[in-house]
Amino acid sequence: PFARCFEMKEACYAATPAIQLAKDYLAQRPNEKVLVIASDTARYGIHSGGEPTQGAGAVAMMISHNPSILKLNDDAVAYTEDVYDFWRPTGHQYPLVAGALSKDAYIKSFQESWNEYARRHNKTLADFASLCFHVPFTKMGQKALDSIINHADETTQDRLNSSYQDAVDYNRYVGNIYTGSLYLSLISLLETRDLKGGQTIGLFSYGSGSVGEFFSGTLVDGFK
């Protein structure tokens, strides 16, 4: 019982600041560990546009100073903008969604955070073995990737497009789980793609309202 336990809420983004907070905490307490649980239920009305995407699930992640799977890099770039694209008012069973606006906000948030990330850290798409996205539905991340991939060489385009399909394999079966969606995609990638220690994975987290964050992690040797 002698542990600190609290909840973070920010739409589909909440697990990412929880992980970043855990990372900062462990920088001062390297012998500790932090358990982050990303859990939610995406439920929509019958015959609504969101009904085919709905899902429920959770992803539990142990954050430690000596990771055995993925080492988070100190390179996160967040982008925030006031957008009323998705909300669930108190007392409402289902969320209210401005679908077209939400798609545009997602892609803009990705482009802005990625472009600033690339500028700050002098990176290109060729530096990544794969990119993982928040996946409200499986084509959403692909749309975001398509918006920047023409800047990459053909080999990089083929690799990122192919690895994206591996990364959303589990999401196709589970559906949208909101804040755990990005991390379910990461699990899917790690279990279905032939990756090696030392390779870099790019991650894009998004939450309506809105905030997006692009960051990366390096696979640990022997992570399999």
Across the structure, where does each feature detected by a protein language model lie?
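Conserved catalytic cysteine-centered active-site region
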Residues: 1-33, 150-181
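Conserved beta-ketoacyl condensing-enzyme motif
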Residues: 1-16, 122-148
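Acidic, glycine-rich active-site loops and adjacent beta-strand->loop/helix elements
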Residues: 9-15, 38-43, 66, 205-210
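Flexible, glycine-rich active-site loops centered on histidine and acidic residues
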Residues: 27-60
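Glycine-rich beta-alpha junction loops
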Residues: 41, 67, 76-81, 134-139, ...
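Condensing-enzyme catalytic core mediating Claisen C-C bond formation in acyl metabolism
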Residues: 48-108, 215-224
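Phosphate/pyrophosphate-binding loops at sites that engage ATP/ADP/AMP, CoA/4′-phosphopantetheine
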Residues: 111-129, 189-194
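Catalytic phosphate/nucleotide-handling subdomain of diverse soluble enzymes
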Residues: 187-224
